[in-house]
């Protein structure tokens, strides 16, 4: 699979500007690109509560349809984020459109970041995977990647590749780079993180997008703010699982905790009990 890590600046609450930049990136992608991955809330940026009515979209909104049309015309799958309106609520949502222009996967961010998500979005509650270019692909959004359980949930759905649509700001940029390497190793799958760049609402976004193989090796990373390409080979997944498989060999599902205390209430021992 050939992936374009399409990190780019995002104009908060300016859907038309962001859509134009996305369409240009899709149309000008190399012809052999299988999947283009954009950052978190690509279309909307980070809206305030008052801006939701202006930038919020349903999955049938015109900007979404235009991206579907561009994916179909370019014969390329596209993963992107937006502010979704549904059932009277707003969600920080990612969509994966396949090369035919069909919405193959929709994911709502499950772990909301206090500064930009709380009070604006409702949290999602489900994980999903779909097949793109012969790989099973799942999606996470930004803060999600800091919780091992999120990536493990996708691995339990047999994900070969975890995409992270990121909107991580300074000074936290390195946190997600470390996390995505760990998640790839823990689940013996590929992981691709795409972060936004530039400034927005007093925040600075460093980019530092990266693709990681199932051994935790960095395949490509962006060091100059420009998009980069990665080629993922399925054989690497099988190689990483040849001698051991974490999903098969794990015991703690779930883990129980047993504490031993003295008479004055001090904890003496903590034992982890495999479920």
Can you annotate each of these PLM segments?
Residues 2, 31-32, 136, 158:
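Short loop/turn motifs at secondary-structure junctions
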Residues 85-157, 169-178, 182, 239-248:
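Active-site catalytic loop in hydrolytic enzyme cores
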Residues 62-79, 146-229:
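CN hydrolase (nitrilase-like) catalytic-core segments centered on the catalytic cysteine
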Residues 15, 19, 23-100, 106, ...:
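Cys-nucleophile CN-hydrolase/nitrilase-fold catalytic domain and related Cys-dependent amidase chemistry
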Residues 129-131, 196-275:
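C-terminal beta-strand edge segments of enzyme domains
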Residues 1-14, 37, 93, 106-109, ...:
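Active-site-proximal beta-strand elements of phosphoester/diester hydrolases
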Residues 4, 95-97, 105, 210, ...:
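Conserved hydrophobic/aromatic positions in well-ordered beta-strands
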């Amino acid at each position: 699979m050939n992936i374009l890590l399409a990190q780019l600046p995002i104009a908060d609450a300016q859907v038309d500007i962001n859509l134009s930049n996305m369409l240009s990136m899709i149309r000008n992608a190399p012809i052999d690109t299988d999947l283009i991955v954009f950052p978190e809330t690509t279309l909307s940026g980070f809206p305030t509560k008052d801006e939701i009515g202006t930038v919020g979209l349903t999955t049938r909104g015109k900007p979404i349809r235009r991206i579907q049309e561009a994916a179909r015309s370019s014969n390329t799958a596209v993963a992107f984020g937006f502010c979704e309106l549904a059932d009277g609520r707003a969600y920080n949502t990612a969509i994966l459109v396949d090369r035919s222009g069909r919405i193959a996967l929709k994911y709502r961010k499950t772990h909301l970041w206090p500064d930009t998500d709380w009070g604006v979005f409702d949290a999602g509650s489900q994980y999903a995977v779909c097949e793109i270019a012969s790989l099973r692909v799942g999606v996470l959004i930004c803060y999600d990647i800091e919780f091992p359980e999120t990536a493990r949930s996708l691995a339990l759905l047999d994900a070969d590749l975890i995409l992270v649509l990121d909107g991580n700001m300074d000074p936290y940029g390195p946190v997600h780079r470390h996390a995505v390497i760990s998640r790839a190793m823990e689940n013996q799958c590929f992981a691709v993180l795409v972060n936004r760049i530039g400034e927005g609402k007093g925040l600075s976004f460093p980019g530092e997008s990266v693709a990681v193989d199932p051994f935790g090796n960095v395949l490509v990373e962006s060091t100059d703010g420009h998009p980069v390409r990665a080629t993922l080979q399925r054989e690497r997944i099988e190689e990483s699982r040849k001698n051991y498989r974490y999903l098969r060999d794990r015991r703690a599902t779930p883990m129980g905790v047993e504490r031993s205390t003295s008479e004055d209430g001090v904890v003496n021992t903590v034992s982890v009990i495999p479920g």
